Amino acid sequence: LPICVEAEQVEETNCYCTEEAEEKIKKLIEPYPAKGIHFLDSGNYHYVTKFWMEKLTKPFALVLFDQHTDMQEAAFFGLLSCGSWVRAALEQNELLEAVCVVGPPQKSIEEVFKNSKEEPWIDKVCFVSQEELEVRRQTAYDRFLKENSIPVYLSIDKDILREEDASANWDQGKTSLEELLALVKNCFEKQTIAGVDICGENAKKEGNWEASEVEKNNKTNLILLETIGQWMKEQEVNR
C-alpha cells in the first residue's frame, strides 16, 4: 500500500537543505527501505535521492534521467541542493561506484567536465545528452548497461520529458514518456534495481497553477508507478 511521508513541517528545504533539515528528513524516512518507488515532489527536493541511496549497504550505481546534471559545486556555505546532490553523493558515498546521467543538454555536460576534470570521481561518470537522445544515439547508456555488474538505483526527474507528458517547474527536455519507459525497461532487463525515485512535480507558483498541469503529471505518475512497479515485481519473482 502507498505510504505518505509528510515533510511540509520541515523548514529550510526548498532547493537548499540545511544540516538540521537533512537530519529531520532522514528521520522521517528512516523506517522505510530504499527498495521501492519513492515520489519526491518537485525537482526542488531531488537531493532526497542522496538520502535514499545512503540506505544501501552494498556497492551500487546510479542511473539518473534528468534534464540537468545536478553536479554543480555546492553554494551558500556548502549547503546540499537540488543542483549539487549528485556531486555530493560522489564525494561522500563510498558505495556509489558509477553514475550514468541521461538527458542533459550537451553544453551542461561540457560544463561538468570543464569544472570537475580534476575531481577524483569524474571517471565514474558517463552521460547521454539530450541531443543524442533525439537521434536515438545512446551509446554511453548501452555500454553502461552492458558493463555494469552492481545493483542500480534509478532516479527520474520528469523534467527530462517533453511538455506534452509532464509539467515541471524547471526547463524541460524533449523525451516522450514512451521513450523514457523504453530506456527504463532496458535497465530493468539488464540490471538489478536497488530502488527507484521520481520527482518533477510543478511546484505551486502563485498565478501559474492550472488543473490541467496537475492532471497531466498525475497521469504520467500513474503510468510510471504501474509500469515500473510491475517490472519490479517481475524482477523479484525471477531472482
Locate the predicted segments by residue.
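Catalytic cores of soluble, metal-dependent hydrolases
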Residues: 1-40, 44-61, 84, 94, ...
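Adenosine ribonucleotide-centric catalytic and binding domains
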Residues: 60-91
